[in-house]
Amino acid sequence: MLSYGKPFNFQRWIDEHVHLLKPPVGNQQVWQDSDFIVTVVGGPNRRTDYHDDPLEEFFYQLRGNAYLNLWIDGKRERVELKEGDVFLLPPHVRHSPQRPESGSACLVIERQRPEGTVDGFEWYCDACGERVHRVELQLKSIVNDLPPLFDAFYESEEKRRCPRCGVVHPGKQGRTD
């Protein structure tokens, strides 16, 4: 039995869901309840957090251009994703996807997390590079689990204050370049 249905035209699927690929939703999961989290993410979209995924992530930039800010060895690096590019991100590489172009679309494939495996979400100080805040959770639903975590960070000056230099992270308006 084909529990995920028959083959379909992926481009047509994207066109039919394009209204969900922009703010405030920004993404749409292709299949539910599979071993893979297959998501199409649209732009524009900017993030100030860095995701610490315990597993690999696959990116295929379908339309437009995007980039990943990476946090490696205490410094920010940038990986460009041009239309047509694919990229496999190793586990535990802190990354912050940036999709500045309206109408852009990226296929992102991740594995479902085994029970007890946690994802981390981190924010860094724009002034000195120190990690300001980290939250860990067993990720079950990107749509339901993440907004409360992000809101808790953005709404708390205490959580946004750098422990090293005292500068307050600007929250949603933080650095994304």
Curated annotation (Swiss-Prot):
Protein name (Swiss-Prot/TrEMBL): 3-hydroxyanthranilate 3,4-dioxygenase
GO biological process: anthranilate metabolic process; L-tryptophan catabolic process; NAD biosynthetic process; quinolinate biosynthetic process
Lineage: Bacteria, Pseudomonadati, Pseudomonadota, Betaproteobacteria, Burkholderiales
Positions that bind substrate: E57, R99, E110
Cofactor stoichiometry and binding remark: Binds 2 Fe(2+) ions per subunit.
Metabolic or biological pathway, per its Swiss-Prot or TrEMBL entry: Cofactor biosynthesis; NAD(+) biosynthesis; quinolinate from L-kynurenine: step 3/3
A Gene Ontology molecular function term of the record: ferrous iron binding
Cofactor: Fe(2+)
Binding sites annotated in the UniProt record for Fe cation 1: H51, E57, H95
Catalytic reactions on record: 3-hydroxyanthranilate + O2 = (2Z,4Z)-2-amino-3-carboxymuconate 6-semialdehyde
Residue sites binding O2 per the record: R47
Gene3D superfamilies, A to Z: Jelly Rolls
Cited Pfam families: 3-HAO
Domain of life: Bacteria
Entry EC no(s): 1.13.11.6
Chain sites annotated for binding Fe cation 2: C125, C128, C162, C165
Assigned protein family: Belongs to the 3-HAO family.
Keyword Oxidoreductase attached: yes
Keyword Metal-binding: yes
NCBIfam families per the UniProt record, alphabetical: anthran_nbaC, PRK13264.1
Described function: Catalyzes the oxidative ring opening of 3-hydroxyanthranilate to 2-amino-3-carboxymuconate semialdehyde, which spontaneously cyclizes to quinolinate.
Keywords from the named record: Dioxygenase, Iron, Metal-binding, Oxidoreductase, Pyridine nucleotide biosynthesis
Quaternary structure (record): Homodimer.
